[in-house]
């Protein structure tokens, strides 16, 4: 029978196996998903951008290929036309969105680093979807406040957030106003490398440990928000979909 110490070590070791490629505990199973249904159907521009991003020193920040495929299909299913993305990086998820939208679809994209976006921009332009994107460099909160001041409440069909986790709740307070009733907000990284269930003494990378409490706080708040229906999925690093069902509290 395992002792408490042995069990703690087992849990910590198990946590180390989770999250470095996906939340699946088997790399072989994740590779099977990628090689069977993701990579063979990945649009050529997305493949090119994924390979460019893989060479970036911060490549861990990119949306995974399976999540990109999921977002692309989701946007088609809900017939999204007017969308927003907070946190762009090199633009992999942005490209997945742009390819899914109709010719007159629009994406308001925000990131504090234009340089990373411009790394992927030639691929986006070659794919013929750059005209759908309105990129704004800088913090998102002032832009969101201005949208509300300009009367843009309820004007977005879909909003994807993959940015600074310590601001997720601040974003939510504003995005719930900007997404339409029946529209979706997708919060990325809501299982945060699996750390949301890691024991207190688990060996976590510094940035994972720092943002863990913010992710836990967000998850708790979303679960209690009566204005939305939610669905948390173990795709990529965890994504929580929030469907707005109520105008206000």
Curated annotation (Swiss-Prot):
Its cofactor is a divalent metal cation. Gene3D superfamilies: Vaccinia Virus protein VP39. A divalent metal cation binds at residues 162, 188-189. Substrate binds at residues 21, 162, 193. The keyword S-adenosyl-L-methionine applies. One of its GO terms (biological process) is lignin biosynthetic process. Its EC number is 2.1.1.104. Keywords: Lignin biosynthesis, Metal-binding, Methyltransferase, S-adenosyl-L-methionine, Transferase. It is an enzyme of class 2 (transferase). SUPFAM superfamilies: S-adenosyl-L-methionine-dependent methyltransferases. S-adenosyl-L-methionine binds at residues 63, 85, 87-88, 93, 111, 140, 164. Pathway: Aromatic compound metabolism; phenylpropanoid biosynthesis. One of its GO terms (molecular function) is caffeoyl-CoA O-methyltransferase activity. InterPro entries: Cation-dep_OMT, SAM-dependent_MTases_sf, SAM_O-MeTrfase. It catalyses: (E)-caffeoyl-CoA + S-adenosyl-L-methionine = (E)-feruloyl-CoA + S-adenosyl-L-homocysteine + H(+). Binds 1 divalent metal cation per subunit. Homodimer. Belongs to the class I-like SAM-binding methyltransferase superfamily. Cation-dependent O-methyltransferase family. CCoAMT subfamily. Methylates caffeoyl-CoA to feruloyl-CoA and 5-hydroxyferuloyl-CoA to sinapoyl-CoA. Plays a role in the synthesis of feruloylated polysaccharides. Involved in the reinforcement of the plant cell wall. Also involved in the responding to wounding or pathogen challenge by the increased formation of cell wall-bound ferulic acid polymers. This is Caffeoyl-CoA O-methyltransferase. It comes from Eucalyptus gunnii (Cider gum).
């Amino acid at each position: 029978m395992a002792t408490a110490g042995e069990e703690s070590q087992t849990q910590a070791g198990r946590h180390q196996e989770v999250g470095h490629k996906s939340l699946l505990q088997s790399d072989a199973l994740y590779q099977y998903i990628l090689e069977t249904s993701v990579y063979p159907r990945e649009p050529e521009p997305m493949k090119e951008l994924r390979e460019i991003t893989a060479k970036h020193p911060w490549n861990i920040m990119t949306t995974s290929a399976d999540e990109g495929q999921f977002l692309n299909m989701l946007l088609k299913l809900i017939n999204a036309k007017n969308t927003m993305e907070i946190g762009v990086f090199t633009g992999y998820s942005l490209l997945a969105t742009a390819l899914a939208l109709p010719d007159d679809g629009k994406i308001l994209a925000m990131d504090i680093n234009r340089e990373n976006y411009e790394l992927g921009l030639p691929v986006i332009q070659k794919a013929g979807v750059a005209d759908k994107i309105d990129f704004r460099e800088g913090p998102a909160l002032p832009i969101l406040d201005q949208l509300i001041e300009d009367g843009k409440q309820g004007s977005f069909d879909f909003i994807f957030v993959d940015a600074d986790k310590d601001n997720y709740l601040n974003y939510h307070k504003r995005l719930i106003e900007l997404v339409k009733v029946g529209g979706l907000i997708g919060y990325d990284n809501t299982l945060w490398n699996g750390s949301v269930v890691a024991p207190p003494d688990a060996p976590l990378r510094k940035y994972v440990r720092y943002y863990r409490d913010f992710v836990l706080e967000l998850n708790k708040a979303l679960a209690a928000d009566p204005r939305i229906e939610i669905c948390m999925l173990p795709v990529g690093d965890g994504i929580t979909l929030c469907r707005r069902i109520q105008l206000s509290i």
